[in-house]
C-alpha cells in the first residue's frame, strides 16, 4: 500500500480521505479522556489517549489534579511515547515553556504567546532540520486565562485534505523540504 501523501497515487488518497473524513470527531467529547493520576496512567486511560491520537491526531485530557508542577506534561508525554523534549531558548530551566503573560525581564515578552495579545495561529518546529522535527507535543493547561484564552486545534491531516482538494500544486509546494523554514530568532536582535 502506498501513502495517501504520495501525490502520484490518487486512488489510495481517495480511499484514505474517505476513511479520514468519515471518522473525524463529531464534537469535543470525542476527543476527551478523563485521567485520574497524570503521573501514573491506568492502562485504559493510556489506551484511550493513544486511540484519540491515532484517530484524530490529538486528544484532550481532563484531570482533577490541579498541581502546576511542570513535571506533569513531561510525565504524560513519556507515558505516551514522547521522550525527546525540545527545550527552546525561551523555555525554563526544566525545558518546559510556560505559556503565560511574561514580564519584560523574563525575555519572552516580545513573543505573542507570552503576552495578553490575541494570536491567530501558531505552529512549532519549523525552525528545525528534519532530525529535530517536532512530531508531538503536550499542551498542559494549569489555569484558565484571566480573559480570552480560546484555543482552536486542528488535525493536520484534515488541513492536508482541504488544501489538496483545493489545489494539488499548493500541496506540492508545501511539501518542498524548505517550504516551512525561516530563520529562527536566536536572541534580542
Give the residues covered by each predicted segment.
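TRNA-binding/sensing appendages of the translation machinery
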Residues: 53-60
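Short, flexible, solvent-exposed loop/turn segments with mixed acidic/basic and small polar residues
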Residues: 47-53
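A surface-exposed partner-binding patch
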Residues: 70, 86-101
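Active-site environment of non-heme Fe oxygenases that use a 2-His-1-carboxylate facial triad
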Residues: 2-40, 54, 94-189
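Amphipathic coiled-coil/heptad-repeat helices and related helical stalk/stem segments
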Residues: 42-45
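Structural motif
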Residues: 62-65
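Short, conserved charged micro-motifs
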Residues: 67-74
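A short alpha->loop->secondary-structure connector
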Residues: 77-86
Amino acid at each position: 500500500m502506498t501513502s495517501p501523501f504520495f501525490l502520484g497515487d490518487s486512488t489510495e488518497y481517495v480511499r484514505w480521505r474517505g476513511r479520514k473524513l468519515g471518522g473525524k470527531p463529531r464534537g469535543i467529547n470525542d476527543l476527551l479522556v478523563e485521567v485520574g493520576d497524570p503521573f501514573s496512567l491506568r492502562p485504559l486511560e493510556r489506551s484511550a489517549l493513544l486511540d484519540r491520537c491515532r484517530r484524530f491526531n490529538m486528544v484532550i485530557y481532563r484531570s482533577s489534579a490541579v498541581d502546576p508542577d511542570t513535571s506533569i506534561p513531561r510525565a504524560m508525554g513519556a507515558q505516551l511515547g514522547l521522550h525527546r523534549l525540545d527545550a527552546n531558548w525561551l523555555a525554563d530551566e526544566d525545558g518546559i515553556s510556560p505559556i503565560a503573560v511574561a514580564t519584560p525581564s523574563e525575555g519572552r515578552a516580545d513573543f505573542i504567546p507570552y503576552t495578553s495579545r490575541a494570536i491567530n495561529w501558531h505552529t512549532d518546529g519549523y525552525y528545525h532540520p528534519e532530525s529535530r522535527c517536532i512530531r508531538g507535543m503536550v499542551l498542559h493547561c494549569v489555569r484558565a486565562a484571566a480573559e480570552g484564552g480560546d484555543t482552536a486545534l486542528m488535525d493536520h491531516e484534515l488541513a492536508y485534505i482541504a488544501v489538496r482538494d483545493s489545489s494539488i500544486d499548493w500541496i506540492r509546494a508545501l511539501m518542498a523540504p524548505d517550504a516551512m523554514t525561516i530563520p529562527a530568532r536566536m536572541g534580542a536582535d
